[in-house]
Amino acid sequence: MAETSNNKTSEEAKANEKKSQSETLEESKLENMNSEESTETTQTESMETAETETSLQTELESAKKEIESLKDSWARERAEFQNFKRRSAQEFVSIRKEAVKSLVSGFLNPIDNLERVGATQTNSEELKPFVDGVTMILKEFYSVLEKSNVIRFDPKGEPFDPMSMEALSSEEGDQYSEETVIDVYQPGYYYKENEDKFTLRPARVRIGKPKS
């Protein structure tokens, strides 16, 4: 009986050992599976992170290129606008010059005629009031023109300026160190507004020149 009991105990011990080994093996398999799953998860996450970074980098480069393109476009638009403003300003000045010339030129010949009458020397008591009246009218004309920025100029004694004067005759002499206006046949007119100045009619003059 004792021997039978010992055999049973031995068999139970072996069974328990096998069971324990089986459980240990199962646990080892589970650990390996968990480890593999963890590794796969980590690799997947790393790949997703890398893909996300690559995508963000691509978007960033695209955004940079778009910004540079917008900067270039803005610079071109600004340059074109500045050119347009400059052309518009130049065209406006040109149109204004022509308008002023057209308006003033209609007054200049009558003014020239009145100046000739006003310069008439007379001892006639009948004509003197008329000449004085013409002189007063001329002064009013000059005042109106000046208020409109139109200036009359008589350059006698001044250096000759081909931009605002027209030499109709000349003479040479040792007394002249440079080309100088010695007589004015017809006064000139110019328009001036701020720093902008242009000749409406050149003064017609006689000049003295150094001997050649």
UniProtKB/Swiss-Prot annotation:
The primary site where this protein sits is cytoplasm
Q: Where in the cell is it found?
A: Cytoplasm
Superkingdom, according to UniProt? Bacteria
What Gene Ontology molecular function terms does this protein carry? adenyl-nucleotide exchange factor activity; protein homodimerization activity; protein-folding chaperone binding; unfolded protein binding
* Compositionally skewed regions (Basic and acidic residues) per UniProt: 9-30
InterPro entries to which the protein is assigned, alphabetical: GrpE, GrpE_coiled_coil, GrpE_head
Write down the SUPFAM superfamilies for this protein, in alphabetical order. Coiled-coil domain of nucleotide exchange factor GrpE, Head domain of nucleotide exchange factor GrpE
Report any one BP term from Gene Ontology: protein folding
A Pfam family: GrpE
**An annotated GO cellular component:** cytoplasm
Composition-biased stretches, type Low complexity, lie in 40-60
The protein's UniProt keywords, in alphabetical order, are: Chaperone, Cytoplasm, Stress response
UniProt-annotated stretches for the region Disordered: 1-68
On subunit structure and binding partners, the annotation says: Homodimer.
Q: Please describe what this protein does.
A: Participates actively in the response to hyperosmotic and heat shock by preventing the aggregation of stress-denatured proteins, in association with DnaK and GrpE. It is the nucleotide exchange factor for DnaK and may function as a thermosensor. Unfolded proteins bind initially to DnaJ; upon interaction with the DnaJ-bound protein, DnaK hydrolyzes its bound ATP, resulting in the formation of a stable complex. GrpE releases ADP from DnaK; ATP binding to DnaK triggers the release of the substrate protein, thus completing the reaction cycle.
The similarity comment for this entry is: Belongs to the GrpE family.
Q: What is this protein called?
A: Protein GrpE
Q: Tell me which species this is from.
A: Leptospira interrogans serogroup Icterohaemorrhagiae serovar copenhageni (strain Fiocruz L1-130)
Organism taxonomic ancestry: Bacteria, Pseudomonadati, Spirochaetota, Spirochaetia, Leptospirales
